[in-house]
Amino acid sequence: MKYGIVIFPPKRIQDFANSYRKRYDSHYALIPPHITLKYPFEADEEQIKKMAKELRRIAAETPPIPIKVTKFSSFYPTSNIIYLKVEPNDVLERLHEQLHSGLFAGKPEFVFVPHITIGRDLPGAEYADVYSQLKLQDVHFEETVDRFHLLYQLENGSWTVYETFIVGGKETV
């Protein structure tokens, strides 16, 4: 089965992202706005139980996670993805590192650029038009989150929560 590890930002950031995603993101119906900590990976039930135990340990040692969204940006020319830039910070960086070492070993597929995707699969001309407008907008959110999530992918391609991990030593939901 395919799994991934993400942070869901607070509701007001999700609502802001969704106001764009519903028009520009082909994955809008498959997963809520999120910050990817570990890209999708395959694991069996035994592996995922061990990983969930390790994620509980990591969560217990992780402080609340600051989320600061500062602007629209893009991965162009690598891809036509438009996103909300989440400023890197020590907590996010450390969490990302922990999710790519030990039991989770494996070099990350991409350099860690914390972000919330709001547009993908846009044809070149539409991408250029949309991004040229969005990059001029003023964006500023500062929030703190207290959890991250292990997700699994359903047969229809959508993602659902397998387990939620509360940071700072609280019990899991």
UniProtKB/Swiss-Prot annotation:
Transmembrane segments annotated in the record for this chain: none
Motif position, HXTX 1: 34-37
Active-site residues per Swiss-Prot or TrEMBL entry: 34 (proton donor), 115 (proton acceptor)
Coiled-coil ranges (or none): none
Ranges spanned by the short sequence motif HXTX 2, renumbered to the chain: 115-118
Superkingdom: Bacteria
The keyword Acetylation is assigned to this record: no
Presence of the UniProt keyword Hydrolase in the record: yes
Known EC number: 3.1.-.-
Disulfide cross-links: none
GO MF annotation list: hydrolase activity, acting on ester bonds
Entry keyword set: Hydrolase
HAMAP family (UniProt xref): 2H_phosphoesterase_YjcG (MF_01444)
Family: Belongs to the 2H phosphoesterase superfamily. YjcG family.
Protein name: Putative phosphoesterase GK0864
Organism: Geobacillus kaustophilus (strain HTA426)
